[in-house]
UniProtKB/Swiss-Prot annotation:
A GO CC term assigned to this protein in UniProt: ribonuclease P complex
Species lineage: Archaea, Methanobacteriati, Methanobacteriota, Methanomada group, Methanococci
Family: Belongs to the eukaryotic/archaeal RNase P protein component 2 family.
Alphabetical list of Pfam families matching this protein: RNase_P_Rpp14 (PF01900)
GO MF term (any one): ribonuclease P activity
Record GO biological process: tRNA 5'-leader removal
Reactions catalysed, as given in the entry: Endonucleolytic cleavage of RNA, removing 5'-extranucleotides from tRNA precursor
Subunit record text: Consists of a catalytic RNA component and at least 4-5 protein subunits.
Bridged cysteine pairs (disulfide): none
Main location, first listed in the record: cytoplasm
EC number(s) from the headed UniProt entry: 3.1.26.5
Function statement: Part of ribonuclease P, a protein complex that generates mature tRNA molecules by cleaving their 5'-ends.
Protein name: Ribonuclease P protein component 2
Amino acid sequence: MLKTLPPTLREKKRYVALEIIFEEELFQKDVISIVRNALMNYSGVLGCSKANPWLIDYNHPYGILRISREEVDNLRSSLSLANEHRKKPINIHIIGISNSVKHIREKFLHVPHEPYYKVIQKLKKKGPKK
């Protein structure tokens, strides 16, 4: 069995709060493709793989993106250059950057913190999705 890496050897991450201004409602897969294409166009395949972008949460028009700490500047510049999606204009505004999801939600998205176990209890009460 493999041991987990100690915290000093793990990849350092940053969380980015985004606001996407687009005339239609976007889904998570659209946001993922926009971010990856922007990174690919700006810094290539190697830069995109180093950045390791991961969409944590998205509720139109706001989202939370996880990225490698060293590649935050590349992400900022690549998203500022992204200007069209499906031949329609798009604008991606970075609201803020933090090292925890809790701080991103509270400080930039103004969503009060709710402990994870309470979220799970709410989902159990709603029942399974159909």
